[in-house]
């Protein structure tokens, strides 16, 4: 593999310079982190599964007119993406009480919310991603009101799609996180979905058993993360029953 210029490295992914202007290569690592990197482990095969699941979801979103940065998958660990100017927000959509919402408001985990709730968090490891309001976002210039409207519209459409997708394979979409960016095309700019959608960024519960099929398995030391991610991929038809769940793929360029 040719050496490429590294643009950015995060907790679970690395961005490299792309083959053409306006493109990047997104590499999915096997690193699992929680609680702002206070907990860290390398889990063989996680990056491969997240790449495949993200490819599947983003391909379908693109097809139904929800714009994403995804262009195509390059190999088991990498995908070609459009370069965007990232908006420093995590957008969380909640359908069922779980995680920090349950702790913050004293709602029992598993309670279906009266309606889907959208929350915003400012991306900052140093500040541990504090929750912010729409007023904070516009006042500090992280996004203007029109961009915020576009982000919320994207979040609602993604929630509708993902809820139906997972329901069809016996999985409840409890909540999920997305990130968005500004895509510049000539004199035009539009807000599109970026980052990833995978079991790393969603809470997924088996409808019949309520078994967790997401990164909470790692957060709570329940084990079986790769097996759960593999089961999600199998139910979606991404991998077959006999396909191996572990694999190194390309070697990470240092």
Swiss-Prot record:
Alphabetic keyword roster: ATP-binding, Ligase, Nucleotide-binding, Purine biosynthesis
A GO CC annotation given for this chain: cytosol
NCBIfam families: purC (TIGR00081)
Superkingdom classification of source: Bacteria
One Pfam family of this chain: SAICAR_synt
The name this protein goes by in its record: Phosphoribosylaminoimidazole-succinocarboxamide synthase 1
Listed InterPro entries: SAICAR_synt/ADE2_N (IPR028923), SAICAR_synt_PurC (IPR033934), SAICAR_synth (IPR001636), SAICAR_synthetase (IPR050089), SAICAR_synthetase_CS (IPR018236)
Higher taxonomy: Bacteria, Pseudomonadati, Pseudomonadota, Alphaproteobacteria, Hyphomicrobiales
SUPFAM superfamilies: SAICAR synthase-like
